[in-house]
Amino acid sequence: MGNRRLAREHALQTLYYADTGKTQGKDINEYKEDFKDSLDAAGFEFCSGIIDGALEHQAELDKIISAYAKNWSLNRMSVVDRSILRMAAYEMLFSPENTPVAAVIDEAIELAKKFSTENSSRFINGLLDQIKKERKNGQN
């Protein structure tokens, strides 16, 4: 498994715990330390950037996701799907990494297939594709 994919998996797990409030008294930085040994320095920095960025921009990301989630409120989405969407939207719109948008969407789909449902992967793909098109048209 690639270092960035593993970094995204760790970021997803951390954002999931943060969203559910099941942090067991740990703060986010303690969660990051838990998986530091499984990533190289670049992977750890990438993962930390996604976590910190998605949390910092969460209100704005939620507005964007809600605008494209036809007939779906954020509260109705599974926590896993919501976390994947926040991560991917953060990477597409705010991350200084400049990861190609197609790669971000592909990684989000793979995370959904692994941690959620097949229907979720299609939903996530469609929503992120809409964000990509709007971004390309300069509307985001």
Curated annotation (Swiss-Prot):
Give one Pfam family.
Answer: NusB
GO biological process terms on file = DNA-templated transcription termination; transcription antitermination
* InterPro entries noted in UniProt: NusB-like_sf, NusB_fam, NusB_RsmB_TIM44
The UniProt keywords, alphabetically, are: RNA-binding, Transcription, Transcription antitermination, Transcription regulation
**From which residue to which does the signal peptide run?**
none
One of the record's GO cellular component terms? cytosol
| Molecular function as annotated in GO | RNA binding
Entry's HAMAP family?
Answer: NusB
Q: Which family does it belong to?
A: Belongs to the NusB family.
- What's its job? Involved in transcription antitermination. Required for transcription of ribosomal RNA (rRNA) genes. Binds specifically to the boxA antiterminator sequence of the ribosomal RNA (rrn) operons.
Protein's name according to its UniProt entry: Transcription antitermination protein NusB
Q: What is the native source organism of this protein?
A: Elusimicrobium minutum (strain Pei191)
Lineage, highest ranks first: Bacteria, Pseudomonadati, Elusimicrobiota, Elusimicrobia, Elusimicrobiales
Q: Which gene is transcribed and translated to give this protein?
A: nusB
